[in-house]
UniProtKB/Swiss-Prot annotation:
Summary of subunit composition and partner proteins: Interacts with the GATOR1 complex; interaction is disrupted when SAMTOR binds S-adenosyl-L-methionine. Interacts with the KICSTOR complex; interaction is disrupted when SAMTOR binds S-adenosyl-L-methionine.
Chain intervals for the UniProt region annotation (Disordered): 1-32
Superkingdom, natural source: Eukaryota
Name of the protein in question: S-adenosylmethionine sensor upstream of mTORC1
Length: 403
């Protein structure tokens, strides 16, 4: 005789399929509440910046607001621990950073990049005999006189043979600490855990590089004192900006961060940038192209680019010891824009209660200032293609909800 409405499952004490729904709804409500805390901080910063215009003053006041910062840090840690980890399997931003570092430092990625540099330099000298000395050296970069058998080249490749020195800016809860290959320094304006140092990266003072052996530099990092107000230049193999740059209300603040990262990295070190975006890859290619041009102008070369369902992930390699940007002929800081930079105060308030989507025409008008960016269909060390001129617009930080 077949079981009745109770069924075998009920006889064995199994829950009906919809029993987990209340728990899932509760989890989503908590996630929305936490993401609301984070987004409200971002919105207030952008609103103040539009009203006042003095990003130094706004940032100083923000860093003094201990209650808001503490609430933000707790919300971010809770989101990362209890929500993002459960909904982003296979798309973890931390795992991506580790994978890129292993590929670059341990599995030949760095060697291949340096070999490409030398081939480009040799090709440039063969195909452009009419160039003067200044133009030629500009094209060839830092590896003009670097042979694969030279001591300098061997030293460069072995520099990170020990632990990879990694600076995690806006670390919150120090997610890289658990990985053995890294000597991690996590910094944040309000740390969520004790292992993260208190530090305002925007106002971090940079000192002369240490003239020490690698093991002595490692020892120096292990003895840092809290809070951190200054650091020597050329100290780290990796600098990570995970969901950091979109926190700042001003493109110039994002620019300052990238410039400081360049100065803190050793030659051929990596800058890893993760920024939120839930749209498909091509829709926001214009912004990514703009960011690439601005960041490379500092003395970087893009090594890798990936698009996950809720974020862009970029790796840039430091290719020159000094920053090279010409801010007179081009507004590179302004090229580090995010969609929210174009919002009005009314639109920010409106986005609290409903989802507003601009028309294609409004998108084109907002992005008009960036339509003349140079084309670069193959624009990275890895030869990845990212060519698109489709404009975009977005109000929120969608990664926070991950719906």
């Amino acid at each position: 005789m077949e079981p009745g409405p109770g069924g075998r499952g009920a006889a064995r004490g199994q829950r009906p399929p919809n029993a987990a729904q209340p728990r899932e709804q509760e989890r989503k409500l908590e996630q929305e509440k936490l993401s609301g805390v984070v987004k409200s901080v971002h919105r207030r910063l952008r609103k103040k910046y539009r009203e006042v215009g003095d990003f130094d003053k706004i940032w100083r006041e923000h860093c003094e607001d201990a209650e808001t910062l503490c609430e933000y840090a707790v919300a971010m840690k809770n989101l990362a621990d209890n929500h993002w980890a459960k909904t982003c399997e296979g798309e973890g931003r931390i795992e991506w950073c580790c994978s890129v570092c292993r590929e670059y430092f341990q599995n030949g990625g760095k060697r291949k990049a340096l070999e490409k540099d030398e081939k480009r330099a040799v090709l440039a000298t063969k195909t452009t005999p009419a160039l003067n000395v200044h133009e030629s050296s500009k094209l060839e970069g830092p590896l003009t006189n670097l042979s694969f058998t030279s001591p300098d080249f061997i030293t460069e490749l072995l520099q990170a043979s020990g632990k990879i020195r990694l600076l995690d800016v806006g670390s919150c809860f120090n997610p890289f600490l658990k990985f053995e290959e890294f000597l991690t320094v996590g910094i944040d304006i309000v740390p969520a855990v004790e292992s993260v140092y208190k530090c305002d990266f925007l106002n971090l003072q940079l000192q002369q590089p240490l003239q020490l052996a690698q093991d002595a530099i490692d020892a120096f990092l292990k003895q840092l004192r809290n809070p951190i107000d200054a650091l020597p230049g050329e100290l780290f193999h990796v600098v990570v900006f995970s969901l950091l740059l979109s926190y700042f209300p001003s493109p110039y603040q994002r620019w300052i961060c990238c410039k400081k990262a360049h100065e803190l990295l050793v030659l051929n070190g990596l800058l890893l940038i993760i920024t939120p975006d839930s749209s498909h890859q091509n829709r926001h290619a214009m912004m990514m192209k703009s960011w690439k041009i601005a960041i490379e102008s500092l003395g970087f070369k893009r090594f890798k680019y990936s698009k996950f369902s809720h974020m862009h992930l970029m790796a840039f390699r430091k290719t020159s010891l000094k920053t090279t940007s010409d801010l007179v002929s081009r507004n590179y800081p302004g090229m580090l824009y995010i969609p929210q930079d174009f919002n009005s105060v009314e639109e920010e308030e409106y986005s609290n209660t409903s989802c507003y989507v601009r028309s294609d025409l409004e998108d084109e008008q907002l992005a008009y200032g960036f339509t003349e960016l140079p084309e670069a269909p193959y624009d990275s060390d890895s030869g990845e293609s990212q060519a698109s001129s489709i404009p975009f617009y977005e109000l929120e930080d969608p990664i926070l909800l991950l719906s």
